């Protein structure tokens, strides 16, 4: 605050805070401005203070502002006034000692956040042993084992971690575990006075607690007396401060009450008492109750303390009135927002930096738990204007295109702060959650209408294409199963020469400013009819691209769509979010699951399951073997008659033409693409199947083999004919009927007449 605060000296007695603020607001936004006045009157004492929000405005004000209503004024950077509680001992003490005290206090407050207490500690355990045990959970900043005046250990210790996450892991991992042969109890460390308050609940310790409260009240009262004496002495010191330009926080607070300017301390207290909407009302009620209980306890302590003089009683009453005074509520102004789902490690400075993009902030306050002093995961923030608060609410809504506000990897939930009565009503009413999952708001993304500014310079052919695509989109979206994808883009009007690599490069360049851009799919659609070998088909002029994140897809769409600099002004890309069919996506998931099951079953069994299609090569080999076996089994007479018969066509087995889906519906069976090249070898008709790998044998050897096979087959057939004459007779009759009905084939050789010696 001191670096942003200016000390303004040599002001006339008629100077007012409003006039001073009007003068300095010409340089930049003024956060705070007041003129120090005489007690009991509005006359200016000749100096004042101005606080800016930005350091640049402070530098400008030092250079530009030199006069006030025609009078020359002194403008310097205000110095922080450091008070020493023992002023009576000497005002000439070195100022370095009091500077160290507030820093030490701040460090203690920060340390409490990630600090653990280890009870029931063994006397054999040293600080180094304790550090080595807890170092496995994270960075240990400090280890402390308190000792008695005689040097013996007290049986407990403290471990300070770097952040809350590591401390939480250590608490879960080491609670009720043994260290040096002794089971320890690990818990969050709290302030000593709060621990004593919790321990003084029993009836036995009530008297002791009253005595301690009495002592604390006497101490507080003594501090208040010193503060009141210091305030009285401030009148003498302010003249020196005017020359030195010293800035005092306490003077500022007292004088702000008189000048009706909001104090920073009041703002922070007001943040704690802020009631929250439905889900956040519990936090706000607890905080407000704590504030009220604190003020009541202070009043009781002042009432119990025995005052020696009437002046001390008057001062105590004044202090209690100040504490009990209700602060004005700023909920109805619509400038305060309540933030939920905060990370426990998030700080007020980080949250303030995130919210400053929407407008100037009055305060940011993270709600702390009263016992542990850890963050509750929620906060309050008040903007200077109502418009800034509305901008913040719009940016944080989940329906926003940017995806809402994120801090430390968590999605922030922002709502307007409401009164306690409204919060109670919101708890009873159930909020209807949006059920739309079709993302129809993205259907208009990339739309360019004729006659608009975006349509200037677009060729008539491109506009006709856009109108046609828009009409098709409207027709498809009438089906409830069609939805708009959030990550998949459809790109039309692409040149024929653009391939997958060029398109991927274009999309990555469009999202070059983003971090972690990943394209899952990028495919230019091509005509595959009449294409063989490694030849690529001609591009169809459109493509699909799928991103990992919605924000990246949205940025690529807005940069590439209708951009004349990519492919020229006459051929501008038409980019829109792709339409998806839920039914087809379900079918795709089922196919993937089946393939995964097949892959898992193969290494387990080593053989394909029943009903699974075999590879094409195995099918061909098995078919050839089966064919040769059948030929060897057929008797020679049937072979001769079969040779004379004509081709009877394919003899196929009845196959299922429809496939039943899991939802009960049926669809036509889709045959898979062939896994081999060349002419189709059909397994349904065995009439003209060639051997798999035919070899050209020598003619003499081939004839000798044929004769040998005929002799062997005749011998086998004679043996079988004796055993089963009825079957051979039936086959002969069938062959005779075939010859009569179909006639002998042209290419078939004439049947040999039986010789006289065969009978």
Curated annotation (Swiss-Prot):
Gene name of the encoded protein: RBM28
Major location category of this protein: nucleus
Disease note: Alopecia, neurologic defects, and endocrinopathy syndrome: Affected individuals have hair loss of variable severity, ranging from complete alopecia to near-normal scalp hair with absence of body hair. All have moderate to severe intellectual disability, progressive motor deterioration and central hypogonadotropic hypogonadism with delayed or absent puberty and central adrenal insufficiency. Additional features included short stature, microcephaly, gynecomastia, pigmentary anomalies, hypodontia, kyphoscoliosis, ulnar deviation of the hands, and loss of subcutaneous fat.
Crosslinked positions (Glycyl lysine isopeptide (Lys-Gly) (interchain with G-Cter in SUMO2)): 653
Protein name: RNA-binding protein 28
SMART domains: RRM (SM00360)
Subcellular location: Nucleus, Nucleolus
GO function term, MF aspect, one: RNA binding
């Amino acid at each position: 605050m001191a670096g942003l605060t200016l000390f303004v000296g040599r002001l006339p007695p008629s100077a007012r805070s409003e006039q001073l603020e009007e003068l300095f607001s010409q340089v930049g936004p003024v956060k705070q401005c007041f003129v120090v006045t005489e007690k009991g009157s509005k006359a200016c004492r000749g100096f004042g203070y101005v606080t800016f929000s930005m350091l640049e405005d402070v530098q400008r004000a030092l250079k530009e502002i030199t006069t006030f209503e025609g009078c020359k004024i002194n403008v310097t950077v205000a110095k922080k006034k450091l008070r020493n509680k023992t002023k009576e001992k000497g005002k000439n003490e070195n100022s370095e000692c009091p500077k160290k005290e507030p820093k030490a206090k701040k460090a203690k407050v920060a340390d409490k956040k990630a600090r653990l207490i280890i009870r029931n500690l063994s006397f054999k355990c040293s600080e180094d042993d304790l550090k080595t045990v807890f170092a496995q959970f994270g960075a240990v900043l400090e280890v402390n084992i308190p000792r008695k005046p005689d040097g013996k250990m007290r049986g407990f210790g403290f471990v300070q971690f770097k952040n809350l996450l590591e401390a939480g892991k250590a608490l879960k991992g080491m609670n009720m575990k043994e260290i040096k042969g002794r089971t320890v109890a690990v818990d969050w460390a709290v302030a000593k006075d709060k621990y004593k308050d919790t321990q003084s609940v029993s009836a036995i310790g009530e008297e002791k607690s009253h005595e301690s409260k009495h002592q604390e009240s006497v101490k507080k009262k003594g501090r208040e007396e010193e503060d009141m004496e210091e305030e009285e002495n401030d009148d003498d010191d302010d003249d020196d401060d005017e020359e030195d330009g010293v800035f005092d926080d306490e003077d500022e607070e007292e004088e702000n009450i008189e000048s009706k300017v909001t104090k920073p301390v009041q703002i922070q207290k007001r943040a704690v008492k802020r009631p929250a909407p439905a889900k956040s009302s519990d936090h706000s009620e607890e905080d407000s109750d704590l504030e009220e209980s604190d003020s009541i306890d202070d009043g009781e302590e002042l009432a119990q303390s025995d005052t020696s003089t009437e002046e001390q009683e008057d001062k105590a009453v004044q202090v209690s009135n100040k504490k009990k005074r209700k602060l004005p509520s700023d909920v109805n102004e619509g400038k305060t927002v309540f933030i939920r789902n905060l990370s426990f490690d998030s700080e007020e400075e980080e949250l303030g930096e995130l919210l400053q993009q929407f407008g100037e902030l009055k305060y940011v306050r993270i709600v702390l738990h009263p016992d542990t002093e850890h963050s509750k995961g929620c906060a309050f923030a008040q903007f200077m204007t109502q418009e800034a608060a509305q901008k913040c609410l719009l940016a944080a809504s989940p329906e926003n295109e940017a995806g809402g506000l994120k801090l430390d990897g968590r999605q922030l939930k922002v709502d307007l702060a409401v009164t306690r009565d409204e919060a109670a009503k919101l708890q009873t009413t159930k909020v209807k959650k949006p059920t739309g999952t079709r993302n129809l708001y993205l259907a208009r993304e990339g739309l360019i209408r004729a006659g608009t500014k975006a349509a200037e310079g677009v060729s008539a052919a491109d506009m006709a294409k856009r109108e046609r695509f828009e009409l098709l989109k409207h027709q498809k979206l009438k089906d409830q199963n069609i939805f708009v994808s959030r990550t998949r883009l459809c790109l039309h009007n692409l040149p024929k020469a653009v391939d997958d690599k060029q398109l991927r490069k274009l999309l990555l360049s469009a999202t070059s400013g983003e971090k972690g851009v990943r394209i899952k799919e990028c495919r230019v659609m091509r005509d595959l009819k009449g294409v063989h070998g490694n030849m690529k088909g001609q591009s169809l002029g459109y493509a699909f691209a799928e991103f990992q994140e919605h924000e990246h897809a949205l940025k690529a769409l807005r940069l590439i769509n209708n951009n004349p600099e990519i492919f020229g002004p006459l051929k501008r890309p038409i980019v829109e979010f792709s339409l998806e069919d839920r039914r087809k996506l379900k079918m795709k998931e089922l196919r993937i699951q089946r393939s995964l099951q097949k892959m898992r079953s193969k290494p387990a069994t080593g053989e394909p399951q029943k009903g699974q299609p075999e590879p094409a090569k195995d099918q061909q080999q098995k078919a050839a073997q089966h064919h040769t076996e059948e030929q060897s089994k057929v008797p020679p007479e049937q072979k001769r008659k079969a040779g004379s018969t004509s081709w009877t066509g394919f003899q196929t087995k009845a196959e299922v033409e429809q496939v039943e889906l899991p939802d009960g519906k049926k669809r036509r069976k889709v045959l898979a693409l062939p896994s081999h090249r060349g002419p189709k070898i059909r397994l349904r008709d065995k009439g003209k199947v060639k051997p798999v790998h035919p070899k050209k044998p020598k003619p003499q050897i081939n004839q000798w083999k044929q004769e040998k096979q005929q002799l062997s087959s005749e011998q086998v057939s004679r043996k079988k004919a004796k055993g089963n004459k009825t079957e051979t007779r039936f086959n002969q009759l069938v062959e005779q009927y075939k010859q009569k009905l179909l006639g002998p084939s042209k290419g078939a050789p004439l049947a040999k007449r039986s010789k006289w010696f065969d009978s």
